[in-house]
């Protein structure tokens, strides 16, 4: 039962809404928790035990850290400044050990389930004989969403340790934060402070929230079923049989995958955020017109925003203020100059971020390469920044002009397409093969000689994708210029507004990729 399924949208959600509204206000959060666990069980069965275990551990660590903080406050009463400092340091060490224990257990479970086979296979190749053979049962499955709720759990415990939030005292509230059903499969990866204000209120359903929620859900379905599922046919054909293709066909498939991935992932986010909106719950946005980005750094501030924000908060910032970086900054300012100091500092802080980004996506070398690809590009951007600024000034080029911005956006599109080619490829070796064949054997004639019609899509399919992309692009452009489309629609006359709503639904029914020749496509990010 995916978010795009008929069962979810027309059965699970309405039943949940009905029971939620009937329940007393103080019990509505527990109703959502019950439906969340039912949803997870329908997806992963007995693997629900992993989510329950993570919830129990996270809650206990949060309480433990709170107890340590209370003990610290009591211990420093009446002490002098030096004594207070010594006592606080001792309790901070206790807190760090407790936090480290929680993180170690969570990452240990995730690593064992998701990465154990990857490490054993590569170690076996390295040493020339089987390593740790039989340590992992063959039928051991990975629960859906574990990569998402593990990060949320680590973020929650860390925020409690930092003192930025208070630990929950009622375990059902911790459980709902980690397991709220709309976000369990694909995120967004919310911080506790992002959702706490609306997650537990239990307020009654409101007409405006229900309408806005379902409109957003159907907008997500449009992107997923009309565009992404259609592009998947061509993309899967080329990437699964990459040795049979070259040149422009590979380029077209890489571009197609960028379209597929964005339309599916952002479409699912629309469904997820819309599902939360039905109950008056505000989940964080995960996309902000990423294809308007002028460089890789900006792209990642607009793409999968909550993942980037998590890495920034819990890896980048802690490394940036670490003792190693502080010592380097002191040394670098004296001996190496401002630019080199900044370059090395950025490298130290960004390297673990991009390693983690690659590894988080999956246990394959092409995902690790994908992370390093963006790390290198971002570091190159920082390295050449003084030279670039000098050239712009010498040539009297205003970087804010539309022409220059268009060039930068086009350059970023090329970077994105190449990166996603390796991301989608069936392994790093396959990615290199496809990339080399795309460059060496490029033939633009393949785009017009009918070759593209042999990849599973007909002319009408490509036309539907193009029109769909134009519609999504226009809406995105309006949002980029500060126009809130849904609010603008609310200003329209009721017949016009509801006419547009029904047009969206009819468009999905007519143009969605289903029926003969089409296969139901699994959610891409649910596999991570």
What do the PLM-derived regions correspond to, one by one?
Residues 1-527:
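Membrane-embedded transmembrane alpha-helical bundles that form the catalytic cores
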